Amino acid sequence: MNYLVLSNSIRAAVVTWGKSLSVDLAPFGITVNSIITGFIDTEHLAHLNEQKSNNMNIPVSEILEGIKKSIPSNRLGKPSEMGQLATFLASDKASYITGTAIPIDGGFLRSI
């Protein structure tokens, strides 16, 4: 994602750290997973879009449409969708899922 240099830089490190931590904690029945978020409809994203709008001198609505067009599902994610995934991963139903990174991005990521 553009305009998120620091965030983008640490993402890979956090995912790798989570994987290593999951190996160390699995014998104790503790799971560790990462949620890789795409464009989620939050105040933070709105703020970033406003900054980009000011920098590029184009309407926020145009920026938002461009973002949506880049996502195969053609929409932003909802915070509740991210919360539901986190809730599932923290539940007993996900007790055998550990050391993984799960994208919640409407199909935005083009890699595995």
Predicted feature locations:
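Active-site helix of classical SDR
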Residues: I10-R11, G18
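Short C-terminal tail/terminal secondary-structure segment
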Residues: T87, T98-I112
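Short, small/polar-rich loop/turn modules that mediate ligand/substrate recognition or access, typified
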Residues: A26, T31, I97-G99
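Conserved SDR Rossmann-fold cofactor-binding beta-strand/turn motif
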Residues: T31-D41, A90, P103-D105
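Active-site loop immediately N-terminal to the catalytic Tyr-X3-Lys motif
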Residues: M1-V5, P27-F28, N74, D92
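Short-chain dehydrogenase/reductase
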Residues: G18-K19, G83-A86, A90
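Short, flexible catalytic-loop segment of classical short-chain dehydrogenase/reductase
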Residues: T37-H47, Q51
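A conserved structural motif in NAD(P)-dependent oxidoreductases
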Residues: M56-P59, I71-M82, K93
